[in-house]
C-alpha cells in the first residue's frame, strides 16, 4: 500500500510540474518572460528566456522578412515586414494579429500576386500610444486606434518622391528621415526639409544627395538622427541646424544607426555593430553594459534583429545586426563572374583578338548584345512581333556561344528593354510613351525612343524575346534600360497604359521582372544606374534596388567613376577617387539588395572624363569591388576594345 501511495503521489507531482511548465510556456509565448525578442531568417520570431530561444511566430505568415520590431509603453509589440504587412501582439495575446490595411497593398498587374508594399518606417506617438504612423516607402499613413483603421496622410509637395526611412512624432509634427532628401518636417500645413549640417554627397555645384536617415528621435525638444554607412549621428536643438555627435564608428563602410531611445539622462543608440549609451550631461559615448549580455544570446543563425524588453536599467530597444552572410556569390552558378562586354563591331572585325584578351587574363564571362539600343535583334529567333517589326538579324550567334562554351565561358545576353526605337515607331506609335502637351509620341533625347513600361504588350514582347534568346544557349539574360526615361522633358510624359494613378514606377518594373523570372528558364539580371546602388531612389525612374533584388539573380550597378558628378567624392584625390567610388558602390549595393542577389558591377574600360586614366585606374576599380565585399564585375567598353584591361592585368 505505501508503494501504491508513492506512485499516486509521484503522478500528482509530475502533473503539477507539467501544468506549471505549460503556464510558464504560455506566459513566455505571450512575451511576459522573454528578455529579448528576435528575428531569425527562415525561422521567424523567437523569444530569449536567458538560456534559449523559443518559438514566438504564432499567427505570422510562413516566409516573412522582418523589418522592425518595437514595443509601446504597455508592452504591446509591433512587427513590420518587407512584403507581409504589419502585426501586433499585446501582452495578453497568444499570437500575432495582422493589422495591415488594404491601403498598404502592392499595386500589380500580375494575376495571383497578393502582397504588401514594404513598410519602410514606423513610429508610435509617445504621448498617445494608440496613434501609430508608418510609411510604405513613398506614402505615409496614420492610425488613431492602435491599428484597427488606417488613413493616408496628405503631404504637401510630396509627389511620391520622398522615400521615407524613419519616423518620429512630436505633437502635431511628423519628423521623417528619407533615403536621399534628408529630414522632412511634416504638418498639415507645411512640408519643410531641415538639412543644414547633415551628411551629404555633392554632385555638381550645390546639388547634392543627403545620406540615408536610418533613425530619428525627438527627445527633450531636441532632434537626434542616425545615418547609414558610417556617417554617425547628428543633433539639432532648433530643428533647423545640425551638429555632429562624436559617435564611435567601427566600420565606416557599412555601420548604420538604427535606434535612438531615451532613458533618464541617457540616450541608447544601437548601431549594426554595437549598443552605445550617450550621457546627455557630459556628452560622452560608451559601450552599453548590455552589449556583453546581448552577445551571449547570439548564435550563428541570428538573430539579425531583436527587441530588448524594457527594464529598470534600460528602455525598450530595437537592435539591427549586419550579420547576414553575402553567400550568393559562392553558392550560385551565376556568382563569382568576371566579365567583358563585346560589341558586334568587335565580333565582326577582331573576335580572335577579343578572345585572346579574355582567355589570357582568365575572365570567365562575356556579355553580348542580342536586343540592342535601337530594338534590333542580333539573333535568328522566332517571334511574330519581331518579324512584323523587321528587326531580326541572322547572325552567327550560335557559333559564338559554342566557341565561348568550349572555353568554359559563361555567356550573358544583353537585351535593351524599354528603350526601343523600332517598337516605338511601329503601329502608329501605339506603344510609345505619350506627350501630354503635344498629344504625340513623347521625345526625350532625339536618339532615344521610349516605349510605355505600363503596357502589357511591351512587357510581354520583351519577355518573349528573352525566352527565345535563352533557347540559343545563353547562360543568363541581362535586361538593360529597365527603367523610365531620365532625359528630356520627362514632366510631359503620359503613360496611357497605367491602370492606377498610385502605382509606384518600381512596381511596374517589379511586375515585369517577376513575370520574366517565372517564364525564363535561365538566370535573369538587370542593369541599374550607379546612384541607385547608393540611395533608394525608388519612384524616380523605377530602379528600387531592394525591391527588384527579390526577382533577379544578379544586378549590375553602372558605377563608372567618370559618370559620377564632378563634385562627388572630391575629398579624395583624383588618383584614389575611382577606387573609393567603386568600393563604396560595392558595399552599398550589397547592403541595399539585402545580400540576396549577386552584385556584378559594371566598371569602366574606356577613357572618358578620367584624368588618371591608365592601367592603375583599371586595377583600382577591381580592388574597389573586392574591398567593398564583392567578387563579380564586368568591364564595359562601347566597342568591346579591352586593350587597356589587358595592359592592366598583364602588369599585375
List the predicted regions and their residue ranges.
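Aromatic-lined carbohydrate-recognition surfaces of secreted/lumenal glycan-active proteins
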Residues: 412-420, 478-481, 504-541, 596-607
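Active-site-adjacent "subsite" loops/lids of carbohydrate-active enzymes
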Residues: 332-346, 418-471
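Glycine-rich, aromatic-flanked loop segments that form ligand/cofactor-binding clefts
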Residues: 365-370, 396-443, 478-479
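Short coil-to-beta transitions that initiate beta-strands within beta-rich domains
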Residues: 30, 42, 57-72, 102-127, ...
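Catalytic domains of carbohydrate-active enzymes, especially glycoside hydrolases
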Residues: 352-375, 471-476, 554, 628-632
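Substrate-binding cleft of secreted/luminal carbohydrate-active enzymes
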Residues: 552-566, 575-582, 588-652
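Conserved Ser/Thr-centered positions that define the repeating blades of beta-propeller domains
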Residues: 46-50, 88-90, 126, 143-144, ...
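Conserved beta-propeller blade signature
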Residues: 34-38, 76-78, 87, 131-133, ...
Amino acid at each position: 500500500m505505501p508503494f501504491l501511495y508513492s506512485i499516486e503521489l509521484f503522478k500528482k507531482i509530475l502533473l503539477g510540474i507539467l501544468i506549471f511548465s505549460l503556464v510558464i510556456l504560455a506566459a513566455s509565448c505571450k512575451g511576459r518572460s522573454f528578455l529579448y525578442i528576435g528575428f531569425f531568417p527562415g525561422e521567424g520570431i523567437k523569444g530569449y528566456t536567458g538560456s534559449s530561444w523559443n518559438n514566438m511566430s504564432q499567427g505570422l505568415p510562413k516566409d516573412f522578412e522582418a523589418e522592425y520590431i518595437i514595443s509601446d509603453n504597455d508592452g504591446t509589440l509591433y512587427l513590420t515586414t518587407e512584403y507581409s504587412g504589419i502585426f501586433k501582439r499585446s501582452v495578453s495575446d497568444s499570437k500575432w494579429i495582422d493589422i495591415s490595411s488594404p491601403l498598404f497593398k502592392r499595386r500589380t498587374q500580375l494575376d495571383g500576386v497578393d502582397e504588401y508594399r514594404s513598410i519602410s518606417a514606423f513610429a508610435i506617438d509617445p504621448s498617445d500610444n494608440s496613434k501609430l504612423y508608418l510609411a510604405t516607402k513613398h506614402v505615409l499613413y496614420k492610425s488613431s486606434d492602435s491599428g484597427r483603421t488606417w488613413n493616408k496622410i496628405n503631404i504637401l509637395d510630396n509627389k511620391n518622391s520622398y522615400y521615407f526611412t524613419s519616423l518620429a512624432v512630436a505633437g502635431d509634427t511628423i519628423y521623417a528621415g528619407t533615403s536621399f532628401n534628408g529630414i522632412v518636417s511634416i504638418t498639415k500645413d507645411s512640408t519643410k526639409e531641415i538639412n543644414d549640417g547633415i551628411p551629404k554627397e555633392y554632385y555638381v555645384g550645390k546639388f547634392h544627395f543627403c545620406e540615408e536617415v536610418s533613425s530619428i528621435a525627438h527627445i527633450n525638444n531636441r532632434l537626434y538622427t542616425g545615418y547609414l554607412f558610417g556617417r554617425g549621428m547628428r543633433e539639432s536643438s532648433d530643428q533647423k541646424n545640425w551638429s555632429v555627435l562624436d559617435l564611435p564608428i567601427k566600420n565606416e563602410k557599412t555601420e548604420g544607426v538604427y535606434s535612438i531611445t531615451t532613458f533618464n539622462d541617457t540616450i541608447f543608440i544601437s548601431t549594426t555593430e554595437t549598443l552605445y549609451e550617450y550621457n546627455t550631461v557630459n556628452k560622452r559615448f560608451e559601450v552599453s553594459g548590455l552589449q556583453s549580455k546581448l552577445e551571449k544570446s547570439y548564435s550563428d543563425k541570428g538573430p539579425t534583429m531583436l527587441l530588448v524588453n524594457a527594464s529598470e536599467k534600460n528602455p525598450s530597444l530595437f537592435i539591427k545586426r549586419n550579420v547576414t552572410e553575402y553567400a550568393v556569390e559562392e553558392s550560385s552558378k551565376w556568382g563569382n563572374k568576371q566579365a567583358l562586354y563585346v560589341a558586334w563591331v568587335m565580333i565582326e572585325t577582331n573576335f580572335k583578338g577579343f578572345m585572346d584578351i579574355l582567355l589570357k587574363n582568365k575572365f570567365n564571362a562575356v556579355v553580348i548584345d542580342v536586343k540592342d539600343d535601337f530594338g534590333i535583334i542580333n539573333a535568328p529567333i522566332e517571334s511574330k512581333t519581331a518579324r512584323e517589326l523587321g528587326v531580326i538579324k541572322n547572325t552567327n550567334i550560335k557559333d559564338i556561344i559554342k566557341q565561348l562554351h568550349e572555353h568554359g565561358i559563361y555567356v550573358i545576353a544583353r537585351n535593351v528593354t524599354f528603350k526601343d526605337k523600332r517598337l516605338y515607331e511601329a503601329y502608329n506609335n501605339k506603344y510609345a510613351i505619350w506627350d501630354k502637351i503635344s498629344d504625340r509620341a513623347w521625345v526625350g533625347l532625339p536618339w532615344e525612343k521610349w516605349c510605355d513600361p505600363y503596357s502589357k504588350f511591351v512587357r510581354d514582347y520583351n519577355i518573349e524575346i528573352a525566352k527565345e534568346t535563352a533557347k540559343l544557349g545563353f547562360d543568363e539574360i541581362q535586361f538593360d534600360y529597365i527603367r523610365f526615361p531620365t532625359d528630356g522633358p520627362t514632366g510631359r510624359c503620359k503613360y496611357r497604359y497605367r491602370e492606377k494613378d498610385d502605382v509606384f514606377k518600381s512596381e511596374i518594373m517589379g511586375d515585369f521582372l517577376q513575370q520574366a523570372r517565372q517564364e525564363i528558364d535561365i538566370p535573369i539580371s538587370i542593369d541599374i544606374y550607379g546612384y541607385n546602388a547608393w540611395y533608394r531612389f525608388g519612384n524616380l525612374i523605377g530602379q528600387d534596388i531592394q525591391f527588384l533584388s527579390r526577382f533577379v539573380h544578379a544586378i549590375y550597378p553602372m558605377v563608372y567613376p567618370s559618370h559620377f558628378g564632378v563634385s562627388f567624392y572630391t575629398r579624395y584625390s583624383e588618383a584614389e577617387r575611382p577606387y573609393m567610388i567603386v568600393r563604396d558602390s560595392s558595399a552599398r549595393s550589397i547592403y541595399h539588395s539585402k545580400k540576396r542577389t549577386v552584385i556584378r558591377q559594371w566598371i569602366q574600360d574606356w577613357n572618358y572624363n578620367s584624368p588618371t586614366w591608365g592601367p592603375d585606374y583599371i586595377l583600382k576599380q577591381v580592388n574597389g569591388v573586392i574591398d567593398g565585399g564583392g567578387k563579380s564585375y564586368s568591364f564595359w567598353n562601347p566597342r568591346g576594345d579591352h586593350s587597356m584591361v589587358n595592359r592592366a592585368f598583364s602588369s599585375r
